[in-house]
Amino acid sequence: MKRWLSLLTLLLLLAFPACAEQETRIIDRITYPGAEPEFAFTPDAELLEIVFPQVLNADAMLLRSGGHAILVDCASAHQAGRVTTMLKELGVKKLDAIINSHPHYDHLQGFELVAKAVEVGELRVAFPADYNKHMLKAMEAADELDVPVEFYGDGDVYTLGNATLTAWCKGDDTWNCNERSAVLKVRFGSATALLTGDMLYRTQIKLLETIPAEELRADILKYPHHGLNKLNDDFYNAVSPKFTVITNNGTKPKEGKKYLSYKHTAFAFTVPGYVSLTTDGETWLIQRLTPGSLVDENAYADEMQEE
């Protein structure tokens, strides 16, 4: 009987593939400001929010769901104030965790300032504690601020409300830091996002070789390495993003901007204003929130540092 039920289930999935994986809807009010003006999530809807602060050539993103909040990366020391300002304006007083994709200054150096501004439950890292000076500094700050440090690796899953973040750490010790960036696949209902750190071409090839194509597919793509590099075509086709966020302004990331324009993929830069992506698991509402003050989109807060 069980075998018959399994066969029947398989036949139903083959006959109605749309039922197996619901297609999410995108309401993009950044590209199309007047899109579906009457739409709003129901007051009791459980939501996942992803919000990008006004950082450029650096990464930080807030994820909130089910009364919990985390940061993925925390920008540089010079731009951490932009992160803490956003947290204050959005009413975030506690972060369950800060998850670091890789220990470069523009992704990890802001940890100390953020952890002094809000309560941080833990710092999660995917590299050895002594990997470089930025890791050593973060470990020292975590110790001084009594923030526990947890190490994560390939296949580990982090739960945020009813959302999950699955880590893909496919690089090896011979790869450079950017190439070894942890990639996080976010799932919430049928909605998905891919957060890619600063991964480069080699990482994309490795993901294609080790992750099933259907697992790579994502509605939202955080474009890797601040839009400075072209994507591998096969990787892009596997992900097939409906919307992409570039953590930069409109002048520096020429390759990413050009590539997405060629692919006719909607995208947004993280300055000026906050890029907000909210979903109930079926629909993404994408809009730009107006902060208390706008940063100059052509002015970098960082002097280029040794990564």
What are these regions (language model features)?
Residues 21-94, 143, 151-216, 273-307:
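Core dinuclear metal-dependent hydrolase active-site scaffold
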Residues 51, 99, 124, 150, ...:
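Hydrophobic/aromatic beta-strand patches that form the interior of the parallel beta-sheet core
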Residues 79, 106-107, 134, 176, ...:
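Secondary-structure boundary/capping motif
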Residues 126-131, 173, 250-251:
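Short histidine/acidic/glycine/proline-rich micro-motifs that form metal-
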Residues 66-70, 78-128, 210-228, 240-245:
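Active-site metal-binding motif and surrounding structural segment of the metallo-beta-lactamase
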Residues 106, 132-136, 145-148, 197, ...:
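Internal alpha/beta domain cores that form substrate/cofactor-binding pockets in large enzymes
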Residues 3-21:
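Sec-dependent N-terminal signal peptides of Gram-positive bacterial secreted proteins and lipoproteins
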Residues 84, 111-115, 136-142, 183, ...:
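Short amphipathic alpha-helical segments and helix-helix/interface helices
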